[in-house]
Amino acid sequence: MGKFEDKKQLRCSFCGKNQEQVKRLIAGPGVYICDECIELCSEIIEDEFEGNTESSPLETSNLPKPQEIKDYLDQYVVGQDRAKKSLAVAVYNHYKRINANKAEDDVELQKSNILLLGPTGSGKTLLAQTLAKMLNVPFAIADATTLTEAGYVGEDVENILLKLIQNADYDVERAEKGIIYIDEIDKIARKSENPSITRDVSGEGVQQALLKILEGTTASVPPQGGRKHPHQEFIQINTSNILFICGGAFDGIDKIIEKRGTKSSIGFGAEVKGKSEKNVGELLKDIMPGDLLKFGLIPEFVGRLPVLVTLEALDNEALVSILTKPKNALVKQYKKLFELDNVKLDFTEEALKAIADEAINRKTGARGLRAIVEETMMDIMFDIPSEENIVKATITEETIKDRKDPELEKLPEGEVRPTLKTEKKNKARKDIETA
């Protein structure tokens, strides 16, 4: 009888209910917990976990609209309005698709990866980086020229996924919603439109290797990178929801487009067209998948990049805007550098145009702007820390074109400019005195 009473007295150590008042009582070393308390603890932990994590911008309610995405891109990338619109719509649809496919539905939305085509320095990489920054998703950049087919010297395509996992701090679930930008994708084109008899390990072979991860597969990634071997553990990652953006200059594809658009005719009534009738940017707008096949991409690869976004070569006006307008514009960066030495830096309008002209002449686009400014500023940046009477430097057109010294404003001989810290203290003291 005593044993029966003892059995009835078994109680939950948390809520005090006995075993007859609950569905289940789980025993531990000297303690008991009921099913109700387990459920309550689970809810508390779940709420706390959700409270500590940022609200994901990728949920349908938080997903930025195409117009908002373009407005954000406008803050960092100058020009390329058509490309920004196309990218904004493609990215919006991609993450909307991820949320839609979570629900059980007969219709499964397929992934649309993106191919960016445009000359060097037109903003392809910056667009992809800025998108990832806005969406707060892991982002990785890979160079297609370093990739080779499995079994050959070079990087396996799985190493691209490893970079993404590393940038997500090895949070695979987060990495599975990231963005991968593969640069120089035009360099893995095969040498001709026709299939090659010989092995093309860095061209067609890489395209074949990329097919599966572009489409969506569960890939095995070596956690330390390098080649796979059978005795190591792998990280499993599903690429179905990873957005792949491939970019390339595709030098010479304009001739393929032009050839397709010009029907050759013979005789007195034949229409003769000048080669310079359309510039490269205008021709790229007319690109078709067939042009990419002629360039050397295989049909299966082109099929997995259905969204074609073209960028135009930047003109003088656009390059000047890049120098001055974005949040992190190059001119603003150099002004800040000089400000740290308490020196004011100015660029004349003619100097900015001369920098842009030089970038166009070098055919380096926006990417070459920093190199030109750095070359111009080298001597003055060398002198300023030592010459403590310089308070202002003005970069003129002659400074850029003829490498003449900038126009300098100096204090009278014997005077030294105050350090930035001293000037701030003096200003604060003056504010207090006048208060």
Curated annotation (Swiss-Prot):
Keywords: ATP-binding, Chaperone, Metal-binding, Nucleotide-binding, Zinc
Function (record text): ATP-dependent specificity component of the Clp protease. It directs the protease to specific substrates. Can perform chaperone functions in the absence of ClpP.
Lineage, opening ranks: Bacteria, Bacillati, Bacillota, Clostridia, Eubacteriales
GO molecular function annotations of the record: ATP binding; ATP hydrolysis activity; ATP-dependent protein folding chaperone; protein dimerization activity; unfolded protein binding; zinc ion binding
PROSITE patterns, alphabetized: CLPX_ZB
Classification via SUPFAM superfamilies: Glucocorticoid receptor-like (DNA-binding domain) (SSF57716), P-loop containing nucleoside triphosphate hydrolases (SSF52540)
Name of the protein in its database record: ATP-dependent Clp protease ATP-binding subunit ClpX
Species assigned in the record: Clostridium perfringens (strain SM101 / Type A)
Domain ClpX-type ZB residue range list: 1-53
Keyword Secreted: no
Coiled coil: none
Binding site for Zn(2+): C12, C15, C34, C37
Keyword Signal attached: no
SMART domains xrefs: AAA (SM00382), ClpB_D2-small (SM01086), zf-C4_ClpX (SM00994)
Biological processes annotated in GO: cell division; proteolysis involved in protein catabolic process
Stretches for region Disordered: 401-435
Similarity comment text for this entry: Belongs to the ClpX chaperone family.
Residues noted as binding ATP in the record, renumbered to the chain: P119, T120, G121, S122, G123, K124, T125, L126
UniProt GO cellular component terms: HslUV protease complex
InterPro entries: AAA+_ATPase, ATP-dep_Clp_protease_ClpX, ATPase_AAA_core, Clp_ATPase_C, Clp_protease_ATP-bd_su_ClpX, ClpX_bact, P-loop_NTPase, Znf_CppX_C4
Subunit organization: Component of the ClpX-ClpP complex. Forms a hexameric ring that, in the presence of ATP, binds to fourteen ClpP subunits assembled into a disk-like structure with a central cavity, resembling the structure of eukaryotic proteasomes.
